[in-house]
Amino acid sequence: MKWIFTLLLFSFTSVQSQQTIKILSYNIFHGEQAYKKGEPNIDSVAGLINKYKPDLAAFQEVDSATGRSESIYKVRTDFIAELARKTGMHGFFGKAMDYDGGGYGEGLLTNKPARATVKILPTPKGGEPRALIYIDYPLSKKKRIVFAGTHLCHQFEENRISQVNEINKTFEKTKPPVILCGDLNFTPDKEPYRILSTAWNDAAILKGDPQLTFSVDNPKVRIDYAWLKKGHTFKVVDVQVLPYDYSDHKPVLITLEIQ
């Protein structure tokens, strides 16, 4: 009887120690409907968030109080602040560069308070500046994870290689589990993918049957990812590429169990 009780207690404890988390990654095309020029998409993106209720979300191509946002929304708009307001989540903006009187870069939403760090990534070939934003997220009272979002260079392979090397270096000694999401602008046959794979697992590959993410009207490539830092126990419950056309990229929804 004592043996049975101990076994049941162990099983209960194991189940209790598993945490399920839902994550969204989405390139939002600077807040504009990709196939309806001049039409805003933030209400649509907020509706998507409210429907699927992710715990964490990473966004790319995010404007903050730019002239471009004013041309679409009639007022200079901080997209992450608006998404946070419309969803009840906590928002964090990571500026990669000054743009049109405001900022342009990455954004995160979380369902719990957190603190964000922003790091500018290297661009040895020049081109558009890029940033990495990440937070220390309280998964439970006793467990924390790191959640990161980025958007790598679309112009030069040398930049992407430097950027993934910098990401690997940034999290090399991080003890909590790390999840990295974003539009990485490379396909699985390229060198940056190989470099990232030395330290991370591609969630869609772990799940099986990875789906194309770009472009929405004619999907030909998979460039939007969730990566899981090696050395930690992640179970990929689901990876969905969602069928929405609010941007030129498809949103990716990931469900994980973390031990």
Predicted regions and their residues:
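His/acidic metal-ligating clusters that form di-metal
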Residues: A131-P138, K143-A148, E158-L184, E191-L196
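Bacterial Sec-dependent N-terminal signal peptides
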Residues: M1-T20
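Short, solvent-exposed loop/turn elements at domain surfaces
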Residues: H30-K36, E157, Q211-F214
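Active site of divalent-metal-dependent phosphoester/diester hydrolases
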Residues: G38, I72-R76, M89-L108, E128, ...
